[in-house]
Amino acid sequence: TNGFKIMKRIQVLLLFIVISCSMFAQDRLSLFIGRANKYAAVELSDYRKRLCVEYNISNQLLDDYYRRCGSNWGNVGLALEIAKTSGRHMREVCDYYKRYHRNGWNRILVEIGNKTRVDVL
């Protein structure tokens, strides 16, 4: 019974850690979405530079993501942030986008395994 109590405490601790990590990722994604309008207000060249610097990617990769994300810079920004917060490779996020974009970003997030709701205008 003593071993059972220890196992139960370890399970509760692990659950707490998982929930905490998930909440941090959701907060980061929510912050990005909140900044989306601010990003959209800048010139395209500045936006591209910000994405390259913030996500440490080259212009060539950025152009590839643009083509793979429906030729929409807003989608590229969201996909980059989702990749960063979910720990997925951007290639995977683009594949999910290609498969589920008709159903919106919420469906893409569900398929990736992120429970954050995205309200995109």
Where do the PLM segments sit?
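Short, Lys/Arg-enriched N-terminal segments with co-localized hydrophobic residues
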Residues: 1-6
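Sec-dependent signal peptide recognition
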Residues: 8-15
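Secretory N-termini
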Residues: 10, 23-26
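Hydrophobic h-region of N-terminal signal peptides that target proteins for export
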Residues: 16-24
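General marker for long, soluble alpha-helical cores
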Residues: 26-121
